Amino acid sequence: RIVRETNDAIAFEDIAPQAPVHVLVVPRSHFPAARDASEQVIGHLVHVATQVATDKGLDNRGYRIVANTGDDGGQTVHHLHVHLLGGRAMKWPPG
């Protein structure tokens, strides 16, 4: 389900959620990984993620925003995207 759209990005619920709130924020243009995108693109994705977090009521308790990059970073989809996770306490280290 789409939860937010801009001219440059789309945010939708993850099909295999790892938290009560798990939203992917994806640029409309293709970038294989974070290293391939500009500061403006990455900043916009994080900004959209924070807007979704507010929409989902996560501001008071907190949330996590993460982008997996490369094999060791756990990237399995080679199109830049950020994960917004919230609705439960996050652990560190994550994995």
Region spans (language model):
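HIT superfamily nucleotide-processing domains
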Residues: 1-95
